[in-house]
Amino acid sequence: MGKDTIADIITSIRNADMNRKGMVRIESTNITESIVKILLREGFVENVRKHRENNHYFLILTLRHRRNKKESYKTFLNLKRISRPGLRIYSNSQRIPRILGGIGIVILSTSQGIMTDREARLKKIGGEILCYIW
């Protein structure tokens, strides 16, 4: 049985957000770095640092929280893994789903790399739907 690194980073970020942790440490791979770059560019993550520990690289993410009048912090990050090792989900460029009418994003793995649904629609390419973020 293989290791699902995408599900691991989604779970780590979701758990840290629910527990109001400011920082998350995830293992650095090419896929995780691509996904984290998208999260940083879309504004879901404030800052990213690369950390080396015993010949292993880790990414340290600083999560963005929004203030609420009733609570000190309100969680806002919802992530859902779609395609998984046991059930791959693919979509062409016309059938890429829109999350909350375009407010959320879909992260796809395409032949031209990992990108958001907007980029894939502009380039008119489809791919494997990795996760939804809203």
Swiss-Prot record:
Molecular function as annotated in GO: rRNA binding; structural constituent of ribosome
Any one Gene Ontology cellular component term annotated for this protein: ribosome
One Pfam family cited in the UniProt record for this chain: Ribosomal_S8
InterPro entries: Ribosomal_uS8, Ribosomal_uS8_CS, Ribosomal_uS8_sf
Keyword Glycoprotein attached: no
GO biological process: translation
PROSITE patterns: RIBOSOMAL_S8
Main function: One of the primary rRNA binding proteins, it binds directly to 16S rRNA central domain where it helps coordinate assembly of the platform of the 30S subunit.
Subunit structure: Part of the 30S ribosomal subunit.
Family: Belongs to the universal ribosomal protein uS8 family.
Name under which the protein is recorded: Small ribosomal subunit protein uS8c
Species in which this protein is naturally found: Draba nemorosa
